Design a protein with these regions (language model features):
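Membrane-water interface segments at the C-terminal ends of transmembrane alpha-helices
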Residues: 22-29, 59, 70, 134-165, ...
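Hydrophobic aliphatic residues
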Residues: 26-30, 38, 42, 72-73, ...
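Hydrophobic alpha-helical transmembrane segments of membrane transport/permease proteins
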Residues: 15-66, 155-180
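Short, hydrophobic secondary-structure boundary micro-motifs
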Residues: 36-38, 63, 78-81, 147-149, ...
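Alpha-helical transmembrane segments of integral membrane proteins
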Residues: 2-3, 91, 95-130, 144, ...
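N-terminal signal-anchor/signal peptide hydrophobic helix marking the start
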Residues: 6-15
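An internal, D/E-rich "acidic patch" concept
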Residues: 58-114
Length: 314
């Protein structure tokens, strides 16, 4: 296990380095010059040359890359081109909101999807199973931004405000924010609850048909114990694997969700940075998302081996 974790950590370092390099190259060949972004449309040629010199953009590309790599190794992501703030501080201000959004939605969809999937599998072809099938079809057909807009229109009158002013930006631990972030959770989780209900139902039906489950029932074990200890544990393995994949997609979905609900999170930050051409912030957010995805997949691999003892990490 220790060797596996160490190897995956080294793999994570390589992935982060390649990601940073690719982003650096893509942004370096951007059709919008950085000095034009900072100086504005009315900047003179002398002003643009001065900006390029201050940023070191007049040096060869390899020199710029090694300078960028050296700062990255020190944990220095540079300063924002737009407001001059350090990128780490800028991301740190927005990160709690996005973490609260991602964590809440992930817990909601995983718990809700697994619970509904188990109930459908244990009552296959019953009324509840058929109702859940209809819910799954609706959920799979509803994109998160459509659900977000629908929730805004339905609940805005109840909160006493329009869609624009319904959600106030602020730390996620404030009472008003906790109360109002439930709707973004639902908007993000609705589609995934349907997906995980279908996935868990199929995996659970396969697990309950295995010989070791029939043996456990033949021994007279209580049905709840058979389902929880023998059926669910095996059925969760593919579900947890899918969770590692979907967590990365969830981070991307927060960009649209934060935009719709007016939440000042990392998704809103990267949206604004792309629109304004703020290169350091784009690189910083990209590395953050990559780190999150790599860490999530590492935890999923470890969890898979715990759920299914037949799997051994090497």
């Amino acid at each position: 296990m220790a060797r596996f974790v160490l190897r995956r950590l080294l793999y994570a370092v390589v992935v982060l380095w390649l990601t940073a390099t690719l982003v650096f190259v893509f942004l370096h060949v951007s059709p919008v010059p950085v000095e034009r972004v900072i100086g504005g449309p009315r900047a003179t040629a002398d002003t643009l040359d001065q900006i390029r010199g201050n940023l070191g953009l007049d040096r060869p590309v390899l020199v710029q890359y090694w300078r960028f790599a050296g700062r990255l190794l020190r944990g220095d992501l540079g300063d924002s081109y737009i407001n001059g703030m350090p990128v780490t501080a800028l991301i740190g201000q927005r990160l709690p909101t996005t973490l609260c959004l991602v964590a809440g939605a992930a817990v909601l969809w995983f718990a809700g999807g697994v619970l509904l999937g188990v109930l459908c599998a244990t009552r296959a072809r019953g009324l509840g199973d058929r109702a859940a099938t209809v819910f799954v079809l609706i959920g799979l057909s509803t994109p998160p931004f459509v659900m977000a807009l629908a929730l805004l229109h339905v609940f805005s009158a109840g909160f006493g405000g329009g869609a624009v002013h319904l959600f106030e930006a602020g730390p996620p631990l404030q009472e008003h924010f906790l109360r109002r972030i439930v709707l973004p959770w639902i908007a993000l989780a609705f589609l995934m609850i349907a997906t995980y209900t279908r996935l868990t139902r199929g995996a659970m039906l396969d697990a309950l048909g295995e010989d070791y489950v029939r043996t456990a029932r033949a021994k007279g074990l209580p049905e709840r114990r058979v389902i929880a200890r023998h059926g669910l544990r095996t059925a969760l393995a593919p579900v947890v694997t899918q969770l590692g994949i979907d967590l990365g997609a969830l981070v991307g979905s927060t960009i649209v969700t934060e935009k719709v609900f007016g939440l000042q999170g990392v998704g809103q930050l990267v949206y604004q940075s792309i629109a304004l051409g703020d290169t350091p912030v784009i690189i910083g957010v990209t590395l953050l998302v990559t780190s999150f995805v790599v860490a999530a997949n590492l935890l999923v691999d470890i969890g898979y081996s715990v759920l299914d003892p037949r799997v051994r990490l090497r």
